[in-house]
């Protein structure tokens, strides 16, 4: 059963329908409780590629270092629907963090076959992310947003963070259509570009 949820729920519906990813016989920390088809099939493929070092969806080095600096052992559970279009982004972001930091463990749960658990936790929307039994996020979420919530929850090891200064030719503020176009145009001209935005797309 999921750590931190034992006092709330005794598993019933989807018992046994789960699997974990291994690399060279060792656990990666990534677990799927349910069958990751539908929108979550890509999450499974990316988890396999990332675990093998071939993934392409990692953020830049400075963000990766923030993930590695998170304190303590972190157990995350994300409840999803296989028809949810916002769920894969959250699942893939947390799986990527799990690959980067061996102290993070992430479990994707298909709410449709674990309905009793969903009811017991009073989950109203998906994706819903629990950190050691505490609800920390509901709905659409970007990598940086989720990381900030984990930093607030667990803190960071300052000795593992790197204070680096990077120089850019162009800094674009805003990730809307105009900002994205400006960034793409500048990058195509061979310039080093940084985009400062809460999310791409406005």
Q: Could you tell me what each predicted segment is?
A:
Residues 98-106, 112-169:
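Extreme N-terminal leader/targeting segments of oxidoreductases
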Residues 3, 88-100:
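Typically the conserved alpha-helix immediately C-terminal to a functionally engaged Cys/Sec
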Residues 54-69, 158-164, 169-170:
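Long, charged amphipathic helices and adjacent flexible linkers at domain junctions
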Residues 77-82, 86-88, 120, 165-202:
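Beta1-alpha1 glycine-rich phosphate/pyrophosphate-binding loop at the start
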Residues 2-9:
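Short, small-residue-biased leader/transition segments that mark boundaries at the very start
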Residues 7, 106-108, 195:
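A structural preference for short, hydrophobic beta-strand core positions in alpha/beta folds
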Residues 22-54, 130-157:
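Non-catalytic, surface beta->alpha helical segment in thiol-disulfide oxidoreductase systems
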Residues 11-30, 118-132:
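Structural micro-motif
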């Amino acid at each position: 059963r999921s750590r931190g949820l034992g006092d709330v729920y005794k598993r019933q519906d989807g018992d046994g329908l789960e699997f974990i990813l291994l690399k060279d016989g060792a656990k990666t920390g990534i677990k799927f409780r349910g069958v990751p088809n539908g929108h979550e099939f890509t999450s499974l493929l990316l988890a396999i590629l990332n675990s093998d070092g071939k993934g392409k969806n990692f953020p830049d080095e400075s963000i990766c270092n923030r993930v590695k600096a998170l304190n303590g052992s972190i157990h995350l559970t994300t409840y999803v629907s296989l028809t949810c279009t916002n769920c894969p982004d959250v699942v893939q972001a947390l799986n990527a963090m799990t690959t980067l930091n061996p102290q993070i463990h992430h479990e994707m749960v298909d709410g449709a076959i674990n309905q009793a658990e969903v009811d017991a936790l009073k989950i109203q929307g998906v994706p819903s992310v629990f950190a050691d039994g505490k609800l920390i996020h509901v709905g659409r979420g970007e990598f940086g947003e989720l990381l900030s919530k984990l930093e607030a929850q667990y803190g960071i090891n300052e000795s593992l963070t790197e204070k680096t200064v990077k120089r850019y030719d162009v800094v674009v503020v805003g990730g809307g259509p105009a900002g994205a176009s400006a960034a793409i145009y500048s990058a195509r001209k061979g310039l080093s570009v940084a985009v400062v935005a809460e999310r791409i797309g406005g």
